[in-house]
Amino acid sequence: MENNNNEPAETVQEKGPKLKNDIDLNDQFKDEKEKKEEISSSSIENKNNNNNNTSTNNVIPNESNNNISNNNVISNENNNTNNNTDNNTDNNNNNNNNNNNNNEPVTSFTVNNKSLIEKEPTLFEFNQEQQIKYKNKSINSLIIKRSGIVIKISQKKSTIIYQDSIIACSELPDNFDTATTTTTTTTTLPIKVTLFTCVLKKKQLTIDKEQRKRKSYTFQFKSNQDSLNFYSNIQSTFLNSLPRGNPKNRKIRILINPKSGKKESHNIFKEVEQLFKDSGIKMKLTVTMEPEHAKKIGFKSNIYKYDTVVFISGDGLLHEFINGLLSREDYEDAKKIPLALIPAGTGNGLANSIGLQDPMSAALAILRGFTKPLDVCIVQQPTVTTIPVVDNNTVTTTTTTTSPTSASPTITSANNNNNNNNNNNNNNNNNNNNNNNNNNSNITKWCSILSLTWGLVSDVDIESEKYRSLGDLRLIIGAAVRILNLRIYRGKVYFLPAIPLDKSQMQSIPKCSFDCNICDSSNSVKVIEDLVCNDNDNNNKNKNEEQNEINSTTSNNNNNNNTTTTSTSSSTSTSTSTSSLTATTTTAKSTNSLSSSPRSDINMSSNSISKSLDIGTIPSCKVTHNSNLLNESSDSLLSKGWKCIEGEFIGVVASTVSHLASDFISSPNAHLSDGLIDLIFINNRSKLSKASLLSILTDSATGDHLKSDLIEHHKVKALILEPSIQKHGIVAIDGERIPYAKTSMENIRGCLNLICRSYH
């Protein structure tokens, strides 16, 4: 990949490799002809003076220098093209007092709640006698409250600047003297202080599709004391009290994938860069040059120099990075560093899941610094997978597969002894062949932040790469093509149920938010069960009042909290369905007990699969998990509460987030940090038609596809996928293709620290 910025390689980097295309935006002007534009040579962080020939025009000073100069920030407002309706052309030289009062972190309420802010007590007020001007006109008062600033323009007209949008306040002039009432000049001059914000582009009743822009507000104060009071209150009330401190005292590492999506990453960076400069935050930029570049950075670089690592890309770059990060010896400390995503890809599943699909909104969240734990799934496959693909009519391998008489998947439990006879024989044969080899070196591992997919979804995701230039249309076209040429896959899916709820009950699980009770609890399963049961009780009472006897049986069952799960597959037998629904509390506790059973029966692969993800010299992830999951026999799994579904599938999706793309809400009730996996699959049934699949595709844009009888939905803690070798297909994690083989997936709760918005 060509380096479009033509930056030389970094010559010195603490505790890390020499990585190409690293640009420290604190180290911009080293050529002699550019030195005259530099604010201060002491602002250069890198003492080795690399010659970085970038075109960026703002110097970001050394974070160790307490007198942080910000004079280019205000002057830059003259060139603001991002709908900055309140531009001010004042080009003041400002110094930062570096006020660092660390108060309790600010917590946001709901974006743009005018009635709430008007009821709040006043923290500081400037009245009409102090002759403050806004837009060169005198205002009645300027009121600072906990949730924002109220500008009383007249008795009937006011403007509110919400604290959610405030990112910086310009520094006071160099000639500012707190001992006098005016500036230290012979003539009294108004003192201008500019407030930098990132506001909603238009009035929005909801924030599901929010879009933001830069905006500045400039106030003129007649006395030094008034300007000092305003400046100090802004710093202490809104900026110093942010979770990661004042943005002007922070430093972030930015990784850009120039090939993400429609290749707009550089343009998106230029857009958010101006907001970062407004805030005074210090940046180091790296443009990835090749596959696995981000993985190397995550594994080797000294990330402790930064308080946040930012990715301007799709989900793939973050996927690469965490697979390097969690392979470090010091991963326990490294994983605490907040990660942030500014969406620039095609699907942008994670960004959509946290409501930050707008790049400017994502940049604002980075500056505000609120974080939330993020689940990571450990995906494992046998390293040695040499069984070739065979055609549908001939099987020439030593492994055996079952051939159910029905095309619909069958559900197996510990009580289904007849269905396990073949599995027992297979396990015995493989136990002898494998000699009870439990060596973890034979296991390949990946870390997943989104999903494991097999069948329709992975086919569309991987095979639509040729339509990447079309952006969002890529997935729509790919899905239409694949449904018209539908593929059916045979295999098994083992899963460990976490919650004994049926599909309709799971739809009443509250959606995830920043202050989510489910994610914040120590026992997410119990909280979910309590919430659902309470909701069901209320619904049943209403139904009983309206329909006394029609739904009496259903109401009684729900009110008695008999939450034994029932099969969501309408085509399976009653006895089989009942046996699969006995996932009680012992099921939820059995994850850690899967340790010492014999190796399971089949290790499948394809010699036609594209090359596996190249891990090079980077070891597998170090995160503690059940490394023997693939070695469990079928009988052992079933005896511990696992369920097995075997048969023909259209597609399988196992996800830990709500969205896999902007128009694909895989599981609306998925939570970022509940320790659970949403397992969703479509069985191949007699009543299944291409029209019904197209309907499911359309409904997936809102999450209503889960209401279809054709879809099964389970909340699980872990799963094992065994695709049949009789037909080649695609298995993918986070949109990245992996070998077509037996695959396990296990959720590690709250493993990472993700930047999120703090309002809902």
Swiss-Prot record:
<feature type="compositionally biased region" description="Basic and acidic residues">
    <location>
        <begin position="12"/>
        <end position="39"/>
    </location>
</feature>
<feature type="binding site">
    <location>
        <position position="474"/>
    </location>
    <ligand>
        <name>ATP</name>
    </ligand>
</feature>
<keyword id="KW-0746">Sphingolipid metabolism</keyword>
<keyword id="KW-0067">ATP-binding</keyword>
<feature type="domain" description="DAGKc">
    <location>
        <begin position="247"/>
        <end position="383"/>
    </location>
</feature>
<dbReference type="Pfam" id="PF19279">
    <property type="entry name" value="YegS_C"/>
</dbReference>
<dbReference type="GO" id="GO:0043231">
    <property type="term" value="C:intracellular membrane-bounded organelle"/>
</dbReference>
<dbReference type="GO" id="GO:0005737">
    <property type="term" value="C:cytoplasm"/>
</dbReference>
<feature type="binding site">
    <location>
        <begin position="257"/>
        <end position="259"/>
    </location>
    <ligand>
        <name>ATP</name>
    </ligand>
</feature>
<dbReference type="GO" id="GO:0005524">
    <property type="term" value="F:ATP binding"/>
</dbReference>
<dbReference type="InterPro" id="IPR050187">
    <property type="entry name" value="Lipid_Phosphate_FormReg"/>
</dbReference>
<dbReference type="InterPro" id="IPR001206">
    <property type="entry name" value="Diacylglycerol_kinase_cat_dom"/>
</dbReference>
<dbReference type="GO" id="GO:1903666">
    <property type="term" value="P:positive regulation of asexual reproduction"/>
</dbReference>
<keyword id="KW-0418">Kinase</keyword>
<dbReference type="InterPro" id="IPR016064">
    <property type="entry name" value="NAD/diacylglycerol_kinase_sf"/>
</dbReference>
<dbReference type="GO" id="GO:0017050">
    <property type="term" value="F:D-erythro-sphingosine kinase activity"/>
</dbReference>
<feature type="binding site">
    <location>
        <position position="288"/>
    </location>
    <ligand>
        <name>ATP</name>
    </ligand>
</feature>
<feature type="binding site">
    <location>
        <begin position="734"/>
        <end position="736"/>
    </location>
    <ligand>
        <name>ATP</name>
    </ligand>
</feature>
<feature type="binding site">
    <location>
        <position position="461"/>
    </location>
    <ligand>
        <name>substrate</name>
    </ligand>
</feature>
<dbReference type="GO" id="GO:0006648">
    <property type="term" value="P:dihydrosphingosine-1-P pathway"/>
</dbReference>
<keyword id="KW-0808">Transferase</keyword>
<feature type="binding site">
    <location>
        <begin position="313"/>
        <end position="316"/>
    </location>
    <ligand>
        <name>substrate</name>
    </ligand>
</feature>
<feature type="compositionally biased region" description="Low complexity">
    <location>
        <begin position="40"/>
        <end position="106"/>
    </location>
</feature>
<feature type="region of interest" description="Disordered">
    <location>
        <begin position="394"/>
        <end position="438"/>
    </location>
</feature>
<protein>
    <recommendedName>
        <fullName>Sphingosine kinase B</fullName>
        <ecNumber>2.7.1.91</ecNumber>
    </recommendedName>
</protein>
<dbReference type="GO" id="GO:0016020">
    <property type="term" value="C:membrane"/>
</dbReference>
<dbReference type="Pfam" id="PF00781">
    <property type="entry name" value="DAGK_cat"/>
</dbReference>
<feature type="compositionally biased region" description="Low complexity">
    <location>
        <begin position="549"/>
        <end position="597"/>
    </location>
</feature>
<comment type="function">
    <text>Catalyzes the phosphorylation of sphingosine to form sphingosine-1-phosphate (S1P), which probably acts intracellularly as a second messenger perhaps by promoting cell proliferation.</text>
</comment>
<feature type="active site" description="Proton donor/acceptor">
    <location>
        <position position="315"/>
    </location>
</feature>
<feature type="region of interest" description="Disordered">
    <location>
        <begin position="1"/>
        <end position="108"/>
    </location>
</feature>
<keyword id="KW-0443">Lipid metabolism</keyword>
<feature type="region of interest" description="Disordered">
    <location>
        <begin position="535"/>
        <end position="605"/>
    </location>
</feature>
<feature type="binding site">
    <location>
        <position position="320"/>
    </location>
    <ligand>
        <name>ATP</name>
    </ligand>
</feature>
<dbReference type="InterPro" id="IPR017438">
    <property type="entry name" value="ATP-NAD_kinase_N"/>
</dbReference>
<dbReference type="GO" id="GO:0046512">
    <property type="term" value="P:sphingosine biosynthetic process"/>
</dbReference>
<feature type="binding site">
    <location>
        <position position="468"/>
    </location>
    <ligand>
        <name>ATP</name>
    </ligand>
</feature>
<keyword id="KW-0547">Nucleotide-binding</keyword>
<dbReference type="InterPro" id="IPR045540">
    <property type="entry name" value="YegS/DAGK_C"/>
</dbReference>
<feature type="binding site">
    <location>
        <begin position="345"/>
        <end position="347"/>
    </location>
    <ligand>
        <name>ATP</name>
    </ligand>
</feature>
